[in-house]
Curated annotation (Swiss-Prot):
Belongs to the mitochondrial carrier (TC 2.A.29) family. It is a multi-pass membrane protein. PANTHER family: MITOCHONDRIAL DICARBOXYLATE CARRIER-RELATED. GO terms for biological process: adaptive thermogenesis; C4-dicarboxylate transport; cellular response to glucose stimulus; glutamine metabolic process; glycolytic process; macrophage differentiation; mitochondrial fission; mitochondrial transmembrane transport. Residues 41-77, 146-173, 243-268 are mitochondrial matrix. It catalyses: L-aspartate(out) + phosphate(in) + H(+)(in) = L-aspartate(in) + phosphate(out) + H(+)(out); oxaloacetate(out) + phosphate(in) + H(+)(in) = oxaloacetate(in) + phosphate(out) + H(+)(out); (S)-malate(out) + phosphate(in) + H(+)(in) = (S)-malate(in) + phosphate(out) + H(+)(out); malonate(out) + phosphate(in) + H(+)(in) = malonate(in) + phosphate(out) + H(+)(out). The record marks K141, R185 as: Important for inhibition by GDP. It comes from Canis lupus familiaris. It comes from the Eukaryota. This is Dicarboxylate carrier UCP2. One of its GO terms (cellular component) is mitochondrial inner membrane.
Amino acid sequence: MVGFKATDVPPTATVKFLGAGTAACIADLITFPLDTAKVRLQIQGERQGPVRAAASAQYRGVLCTILTMVRTEGPRSLYSGLVAGLQRQMSFASVRIGLYDSVKQFYTKGSEHAGIGSRLLAGSTTGALAVAVAQPTDVVKVRFQAQARAGSGRRYQSTVDAYKTIAREEGFRGLWKGTSPNVARNAIVNCAELVTYDLIKDALLKANLMTDDLPCHFTSAFGAGFCTTVIASPVDVVKTRYMNSALGQYSSAGHCALTMLQKEGPRAFYKGFMPSFLRLGSWNVVMFVTYEQLKRALMAACTSREAPF
């Protein structure tokens, strides 16, 4: 057995809720530069046609993007928006991941056997609910990641300033800008991520290929990250463009997607795919492995407190 040993008592809803938020914050701290690189690649060329965008592209890959940002803006630019990102994960991951098992049990009416339908429903439900709670933090995070460009003024001076400025200039609706594509994205992401992780892990355990420990969690998380990136990238690009857009640039998320298709072609929907995969793959591995270990550690601590001798 690698890592903490599973306890006889299943983790409580509170343990899952706190464990998911904490694990997601740890994963964000490690993978945030990849997420920032992804955002820069996704918004690149949105005001130009495909030919001009390709010719004038400032960023040409994950490593190039990161190195260019460090050279022109300093290393701290890779973590621009981190505070909002951590706020987002504590409110967002706690709901969409921490409540997944509870909602899944609700749809199966307490049955131990969960079919693909109940898993998909649970993933969609917690993904959409998490967006309703955490959307303002996501808007601020994306704005910060996109703003720090050489030669242009900073739109926001701090996280608090960003919340205040967006609310003042765009109204409170500005803080929930992009909610529709984000609901769609996170329903898709949650289904792909959590359901794929669930299915891969169950298959590995049932086939006796692995035991329920770190290697199993690592393999399941990596597979879930790849599947999620392939499925969710188009919606993710539209979400990023729309949330970062100036007031009146796009009338809706659908208009944003149509404009991208007309000006940049279908490949625009997979802009930033490699950093998305590197980020989601590594994020999933760190998050799920940490989450599984945190659940066991917290339950072991609770058990030892209740029975110290």
